[in-house]
Amino acid sequence: MGKNFSRFAAVLLAVSMPAAAFAYTFDRDVPANIKTQMLDDLSFVGTIQGSQASSLHQQIFGQVDGATYNQFFSSRVMSVGMNGCGDGNAVACVIPMQDSSKIWLPQNYIKFSHPQIARLMVVFHESRHTEDANDNWPHANCPTPFLDKDGSDMKSVWTGASLAGEPACDETPFGSYGSSMIMLKNISKFCTNCSDKVKMDAGIYADDQFKRLISPDAIAQVQKDLYSGQ
């Protein structure tokens, strides 16, 4: 995520919904395989069924339910295009001064291979950045140094880039990092029709994104909501 887009860019997601049912469009420069992949990913998320939802998930999305996720995404994102996003470390971005309902994909989204649920994490992260009424949920700068529990530098799970000092953290569970990790953690815990692999991947990526929350209050809220008893 680039400093020039520190408020807006993200370095930081039964029966399938047919691709024609999606309301958003793809620019011509989006590679055909990436368009197909994203449509397949969003069709998959539309099939999810859950037994329950955590309190924070209910506040942000509602129930753990495919139709709920599709409505959340399609009510925010109208189009997808290609853009460098201002920084070689970016994975995707929204640029509100150009179009706050458009997700832009740089080469990092294409060239790195990650599980389907991780790709959904990225685009749902970006969908939160479309919310003009919430100032597009700007990120906070990560601490310097920014270390994990073992004392190693925190790095992007997607690109491996160092996060210290970068606008790649959040101080609220309701921003892009918090909302997407809450979504994935709920899928990991409560999805009733997901494979073990999907639930495992969702848990791994959710736990990684949880580390992007840097305020004690935000951390405490998510711990109480999703990690108590673990």
Segments (PLM) and residue ranges:
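Bacterial N-terminal signal peptides
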Residues: A9-P18
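Bacterial N-terminal signal peptides that target proteins for export
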Residues: M1-A9
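Walker B catalytic acidic pair
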Residues: E126
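Substrate/cofactor-recognition hotspot
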Residues: V123
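Predominantly extracellular/secreted Zn2+-dependent metalloproteases
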Residues: A21-L120, T130-Q230
